[in-house]
Amino acid sequence: MRRRKQNWLFWLLSICLCLTFGPFQQTVKAESAPLDIRADAAILVDAQTGRILYEKNIDTVLGIASMTKMMTEYLLLDAIKAKRVKWDQMYTPSDYVYRLSQDRALSNVPLRKDGKYTVRELYEAMAIYSANGATVAIAEIIAGSEKNFVKMMNDKAKELGLKDYKFVNATGLSNKDLKGFHPEGTSTNEENVMSARAMAMLAYRLLKDHPEVLKTASIPHKVFREGTKDEIKMDNWNWMLPGLVYGYEGVDGLKTGYTEFAGNCFTGTAKRNGVRLISVVMNAKDASGKTTKEARFKETEKLFNYGFNQYSLETLYPKGYQLKGKETLPVVKGKEKEVRVATGKNLDLLVKNGEEKQYKPVYVLDKKKMTKEGKLVAPLKKGETVGYMTLEYKGDDSLAFLSPDMQKNIRVPLVTTAEVEKANWFVLSMRAVGGLFVDLWTSVAKTVKGWL
């Protein structure tokens, strides 16, 4: 009877344990499953710091198709800012632009050969509808010819610090599809190519330097030349804009692309709760391995879900934070012999859930403001920057950025919390004399000690 009771208790306990721990174990497994992005290359980036949150083959050079137009946008917005080009400036199509714009097998708004179009009209057609004729028109407006513009594109890429890129035309079309009208100096079989890292870097700089790009990139529908015989409805190819078929909360850019060479590509950006992310997928594919328009949005959705669900913006160290044991720095030639220092701003960072304690604060002092002995020199103003505080990451992987110089994006100034006036000559003289006597006494003491 006792043995039966023990068996009954054993089975009851086993059932309870299964009910208690079974679902928990399944949940942990699901949450820790790796992110499976079906694309030849992909990247997810914090748009504030340039920190890489996810990467796959990010330095592999691949076709970029119409994502090319982001560089054309950058150069146009540069020219607008520099007042070399005006939004209301008029343009009449060249023979080439006219012919290209009439090709309805490509993304286009047909332009009249004798028509007059504003730069803004052409820009909207390019940014919303990916119109290729309008894109070459912009290239001609800025540089006089697409050939000259292509040189500007490559020069700007170098200036922006991009690696692994080559531009051969302004649109992203395959040169072979330009029917012999590819830019002079390029060949029929050439393509625009970049790595996912370079593409994300271009998006990062576009958003930093020209945030106004989102005003147009976020327009889901617009009518070109509305109210005229030439009007044509332009539907944004970015189907992740809210209200469209793959609408995603917070998405407001940037650019899709497709050619047979590049496959379906998309550089996206979305903002939620003060956090902006940048994503790139190149040659995105469905479960069968086929590249499709839908796949580029579904794979991007995976990236955004990962970023917004697994990371949050945290104030790791507030303004006024003082590192324990390093609250003060020594000062020479001042009325005071030391000064308190603290951070001049909040140190905010996009942190993966559960990793808040994986970051260690580190002071880096400005050597130009220090003596060889490591002391500050009076006078010092309150709030004067004497260095910066950055972070060391103690997690499994190192912090990765689009480029090494972006490490500076996770630092805040280290400032003095009070003014230190320079001591007058008498005080400095007495200190010097006092120092002399101290040195003399120390020397004598050492000598006497040596006799004993």
Curated annotation (Swiss-Prot):
It is found in: Secreted, Cell wall. GO terms for molecular function: serine-type D-Ala-D-Ala carboxypeptidase activity. It comes from Geobacillus stearothermophilus (Bacillus stearothermophilus). It is an enzyme of class 3 (hydrolase). The keyword Secreted applies. It comes from the Bacteria. SUPFAM superfamilies: beta-lactamase/transpeptidase-like (SSF56601), Penicillin-binding protein associated domain (SSF69189). Belongs to the peptidase S11 family. One of its GO terms (cellular component) is extracellular region. Removes C-terminal D-alanyl residues from sugar-peptide cell wall precursors. The active site is at residues 66, 69, 130. Pathway: Cell wall biogenesis; peptidoglycan biosynthesis. Residues 1-30 form the signal peptide. It holds the Pfam family Peptidase_S11. Keywords: Carboxypeptidase, Cell shape, Cell wall, Cell wall biogenesis/degradation, Hydrolase, Peptidoglycan synthesis, Protease, Secreted, Signal, Sporulation. This is D-alanyl-D-alanine carboxypeptidase DacA. One of its GO terms (biological process) is peptidoglycan biosynthetic process. Substrate binds at residue 255. Gene3D superfamilies: D-Ala-D-Ala carboxypeptidase, C-terminal domain, DD-peptidase/beta-lactamase superfamily. Its EC number is 3.4.16.4. It catalyses: Preferential cleavage: (Ac)2-L-Lys-D-Ala-|-D-Ala. Also transpeptidation of peptidyl-alanyl moieties that are N-acyl substituents of D-alanine. The keyword RNA-binding does not apply.
